[in-house]
Design a protein with these regions (language model features):
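Phosphate/nucleotide-binding beta-alpha loop and adjacent structural elements of enzyme active sites
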Residues: 1-247
Length: 247
């Protein structure tokens, strides 16, 4: 009974955590603290953010939106604009609330979409409890459904599709982004990506690095690879700079 109440009505408790600089993180779902801990406590992205002005952000695999909120709270002097792309139905409430957060003054846009092959209108997405969802099922118990494939024309805030920073954490679908949305990459200055060895390109990190090098990117910093949680394989984090980007 208690577990059911916590699952269905967790958002009614209005849990919030102060971040500094008058920003707050709201925890609307019962597993939100896991994501909050990764971003705000472990600060897994801290060493992978370039020391440059970052105003226009594309947040792919936004989950509960904490990366964009973390970056804004770290840089209160900048008015950051973020497009948060997340296919999960479980994250809808949190991302809608964040997009409406008054202190952000409508600078965060939320798109419920999957980074798949844009030749197809919809992409199948798998939910996984207490971890990020994925385009790839990891067990027979994963719940799946169809989600609209990301359409670049819906990014109304940035018609030129150029970003200072693209953050990409797609649980294996990063290869889809690199292949099918290369125009966004080529017009963006920095890329911070969590890579996964099971991405559909089949060649692990080296294949990703080779393709990015072909596009004109240089890896500036890379973490050690580690065993993935929840499935076989490895993952890691890196920062890359577009050497062809015109300021």
């Amino acid at each position: 009974m208690l577990a059911h109440l916590r699952l269905e009505y967790f958002h009614e408790f209005h849990h919030s955590i102060p971040l500094g600089n008058n920003y707050w993180a709201h925890l609307w779902e019962n597993d939100a603290y896991d994501s909050f801990s990764e971003i705000f406590i472990q600060q897994e992205y801290l060493d992978f953010i370039p020391n440059e002005k970052l105003i226009k952000i594309l947040d792919l695999g936004a989950h509960y939106g904490y990366f964009s909120l973390w970056l804004q709270s770290k840089r209160p002097q900048d008015e950051i604009y973020s497009i948060m792309v997340e296919p999960s139905q479980r994250c809808q409430r949190s991302l809608k609330k964040l997009a409406q957060y008054q202190k952000l003054q409508n600078r965060f846009q939320y798109l419920q979409a999957a980074v798949g092959n844009p030749e197809y209108e919809n992409t199948r997405f798998f939910e996984r409890p207490f971890m990020g969802g994925s385009l790839f099922g990891s067990s027979s118990t994963d719940h799946s459904y169809e989600v609209k494939t990301l359409d670049l024309s819906e990014m109304t805030d940035f018609q030129e599709k150029s970003f200072d920073l693209v953050k990409c954490d797609l649980e294996g679908a990063e290869w889809n982004f690199i292949i099918h949305y290369s125009s966004v990459l080529k017009n963006s200055k920095f890329l911070v990506m969590e890579w996964h060895s099971w991405h559909p390109g089949g060649g692990g990190f080296q294949q990703i690095e080779n393709k990015l090098t072909h596009y004109g990117f240089q890896i500036m910093k890379k973490s050690s690879s580690q065993n993935a949680i929840g499935r076989d394989g490895e993952d890691g984090l890196f920062l890359a700079k577009n050497l062809n980007h015109q300021n």
